[in-house]
Amino acid sequence: MSIYYSISSISNPTRMALSSINTYSYNGSYVNDNSTAYFDNDFGGWGGLGNFGNGNGCGGSSNVNVINLDIYIGRRHRRCC
């Protein structure tokens, strides 16, 4: 199992933007996770994104606004959030 993970963050006085590009190889299947999440200055309640492997797709708390989450598994493409 090989994992490539790249993350970059930009912050300003009122808002923090966190973007990540993840590529996973898991038993021959590839997951490309291109996601951007915006936070205010309250970091409480940050939940998980992706939940790879258990079928839940995208789960997070109500104060997280997920702009774009693209998951590609093999030939299957879906969007959530």
Swiss-Prot record:
Q: Which domain of life is it from?
A: Eukaryota
Q: What protein family is recorded? A: Belongs to the UPF0512 family.
What is the designated name of this protein? UPF0512 protein K
UniProt organism field: Dictyostelium discoideum
